[in-house]
Amino acid sequence: MNITLNGEDRVLDSAKTLSELVESLGLDVRKVAIERNLEIVPRSAYGATNLADGDRIEIVHFIGGG
């Protein structure tokens, strides 16, 4: 499946949901916000949101600092 992730074309072999994508990237699902095809996806829906060929995904990872 081909998607665009943060502006870069990617080919996915295994990730089928947003949760699986986040895990495959080594990110903490509690510390990211995801936009799919210009729509913000609620964190509670990551596991139920299936990826589709051609999806445009933007992931923002929150980090602490001061």
Residue ranges and their predicted role:
Residues 1-7:
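Eukaryote-biased recognition of intrinsically disordered, low-complexity regulatory segments
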Residues 7-16:
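Short, contiguous acidic and Ser/Thr-rich linear segments
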Residues 16-25:
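Short amphipathic, charge-patterned alpha-helical segments
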Residues 41-46:
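Short alpha-helix capping/helix-loop boundary micro-motifs
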